[in-house]
């Protein structure tokens, strides 16, 4: 039962990348990390739900309120994905993934470039 860190205030810890999937759903890991951090008050300078979060949720057919409730009730990725799989159709996951990869690849590339822990000086 793995839980990712959700305290991003140190500037060295980041939400998982948007390309990282839980099951077949891209972005789900990232939005879960950010939602959990927002609920804990440790989101730092991230925005939740940001326009990308909202775009994926819209394509999944769920609202931010539904997702927040699911996060509250499902503290692990495994239990969250069980809820998600029951709630979101495979076709909606496919459409959301395609939108993310085809139309938002610049955002994904920017995450990869910007969300890097600072190099420690000697």
What are these language model-derived features?
Residues 77-90, 97-101:
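Charged interaction scaffolds used for protein-protein
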Residues 14, 20, 33-34, 50-54, ...:
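A generic structural signal for solvent-exposed, polar alpha-helical segments
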Residues 2-43, 93-96, 100-122:
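Polar/charged low-complexity regulatory segments
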Residues 43-84:
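Amphipathic alpha-helical packing elements
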